[in-house]
Regions:
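Short alpha-helical DNA-recognition segment
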Residues: 67-85
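Short basic helix-loop element that most often maps to the first helix and adjoining turn
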Residues: 58-72, 101
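N-terminal flexible/basic segments that precede or flank functional cores
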Residues: 1-53, 111-113
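DNA major-groove recognition helix of helix-turn-helix/homeodomain DNA-binding modules
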Residues: 93-114
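Short acidic alpha-helix initiation/capping motifs at coil-to-helix transition points
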Residues: 51-54, 64, 76-79
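Key DNA-contacting residues within the recognition helix of helix-turn-helix
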Residues: 60, 74, 85-86, 95
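Secretory-pathway ectodomains
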Residues: 59, 80, 103-107
């Protein structure tokens, strides 16, 4: 998956509230460049489902994946503790790109290769 396609799909996943709708809408999309008579790759549905899940992880989900306390997570990733607390309680929102980076850095999401 190219970086450009990944960014397109991530943005689309953020905009769609229902996982199944996202997967069905994008699994047969022309963005993949499949030949008209080609079979869909077996892993595409799983890839799209995992990407949607990652787009909808909260910062708390990501932190809890690590098993770290708020203070330890904030220290490890150089995030002001108050900022992390605000994100977790919904007083402020963590930018989507930062949630994605943290999900990848912590292993909560592994981006597909290729």
């Amino acid at each position: 998956m190219t970086d450009k396609l990944f960014c397109t799909l991530f943005a689309a996943a953020l905009a769609v509230a229902d996982r199944d709708t996202f997967v069905s809408d994008w699994s047969l999309s022309s963005v993949w460049g499949d030949a008209p008579d080609a079979d869909m790759p077996a892993d595409r549905i799983d890839t799209l489902a995992r990407l949607w899940d990652a787009a909808h992880l909260t910062i708390r989900d990501i932190r809890q994946h690590t098993g770290l306390s708020q203070a330890a997570f904030a220290t490890r990733y150089c995030i002001p503790t108050r900022t992390l607390e605000d994100w977790e309680r919904g007083a402020r929102s963590c930018p989507d790109y930062l949630r994605l980076l943290l999900a990848q850095a912590t292993g909560a999401y592994q981006r597909p290769r290729g």
